[in-house]
From Swiss-Prot:
Alphabetical list of Pfam families matching this protein: C2-set_3 (PF22705)
Record-given protein name: Selection and upkeep of intraepithelial T-cells protein 10
Residue numbers on the Cytoplasmic membrane side: 180-209, 274-354
Gene: Skint10
Keyword Disulfide bond annotated: yes
Domain Ig-like V-type: 53-141
Function: May act by engaging a cell surface molecule on immature T-cells in the embryonic thymus.
Similarity annotation: Belongs to the SKINT family.
Length: 354
């Protein structure tokens, strides 16, 4: 009766601890710290299955070899011994055991067993005191999913999965910051030339698609975290009275976060598409005006060059024509001056008049 009262009191304390989260509905942003903290706690260990002031049983999945059960108890009057039994009362040999005494002479016991195959639940940890001839027991029910290979592989990668996820997020943020810095400052030149080559290769549509993919890749990773967490959460069962309430609360929070992320992602895409269309429409008239102005300037420059060439050619032609006439008249004048059949006279008045 005393143990039952203590167990009910511990369950009431757990429910009182999480009850304020169910009564008042706050903004979704305030749940994010608890949301990620719960995930980290579940990554570290599965919460305690059975607790009391005397006996405590913990369930852990250290690797893919099996399920590890730990039973601890303190403040015992020596001598005392701890044993594990299955549902049929058969003794399960323990893997490790540890005992110690404090200054008051009270005994502290700790024992663990490694279950590689599914056993018939419940599993009982009992402590028998030889002096008082009394026995204390605590039982725990193991779900079948704990012995499935999918759950064991997921729990064995409990540190690699979050670290890989965080590494990808940090790498993408750092890469984006470096590219933005290089675009703004123009240094180093290698990155600037690389970006210019990429822009030259890609056309307008492909460039817009790459921009959208780059901007919303992090949002997609954030949204993809929720199904991963829910998949893990559904496998890591917590067998206590507050488990249904806790699971429903997490489901509601995940649904709210998913709806908000999808809504704001769609809104951002729509605004970006609208701005892109407006920018193209405003760019076409300015481009046509620039082209017409450029054609006019080019035609005017060509006409001025043609006029200059025409004037130069006319001047050259007139100059050569005058030189030709002057040379002809000079030759005729020389022939008339040195004709031996005529008297010596010079009559070049016509040449001077011309």
């Amino acid at each position: 009766m005393f143990l039952r009262t203590q167990m009910e009191q511990s369950q009431a304390d757990i429910f009182a601890l999480i009850k304020p989260h169910f009564g008042v509905m706050e903004s979704s942003a305030s749940y994010l710290p608890g949301f990620f903290m719960t995930f980290l706690l579940l990554q570290t260990t599965v919460l305690t299955q059975a607790m009391s002031l005397d006996i405590q049983i913990n369930i852990q999945v250290p690797d893919t070899e099996g399920v590890l059960l730990e039973c601890t108890s303190g403040s015992l009057i020596p001598p005392a011994e701890m044993t594990w039994r299955d549902s049929k009362g058969n003794i399960i040999p323990h893997s490790t055991t540890f005992d110690s005494q404090d200054r008051a002479g009270l005994l502290y016991l700790k024992s663990s067993i490694l279950l590689k195959n599914r056993v018939q639940s419940p599993i009982t940890c009992s402590i028998y005191n030889v002096t008082t001839n009394r026995e204390k027991k605590r039982s725990v029910v193991l779900p079948d999913i704990l012995f499935k290979s999918e759950y064991m592989s997921l729990m064995s990668n409990k540190f690699s999965c979050p670290l890989t996820y965080l590494f990808i997020i940090i790498f993408l943020n750092c890469l984006k910051g470096m590219l933005d810095f290089c675009c703004l400052k123009g240094k180093p030149v290698y990155f600037r030339e690389l970006i210019n080559k990429i822009k030259e290769v890609l056309n307008i549509k492909m460039r817009a698609c790459c921009t959208l993919i780059w901007e919303f890749l992090l949002i997609v990773l954030y949204i993809a975290f929720l199904p991963f967490y829910l998949k893990f959460r559904s496998r890591a069962s917590i067998l206590d009275d507050a488990y249904p309430l806790h699971s429903n609360w997490l489901w509601d929070i995940c649904i709210v976060l998913s709806v908000l992320m999808i809504f704001f992602t769609g809104l951002s895409l729509f605004l970006l598409w609208t701005l892109n269309c407006y920018g193209q429409m405003s760019y076409l008239p300015s481009m046509s005006m620039d082209l017409s102005k450029h054609d006019f300037e080019q035609n005017s420059s060509k006409s001025s060059e043609f006029q200059e060439n025409y004037d130069v050619s006319c001047e050259i032609f007139l100059g050569t024509f005058e030189e030709t006439i002057f040379s002809q008249h000079q030759e005729s004048c020389i022939e008339d001056s040195f004709n031996p059949l005529q008297p010596l006279r010079l009559d070049c008045s016509l040449n001077w008049k011309t």
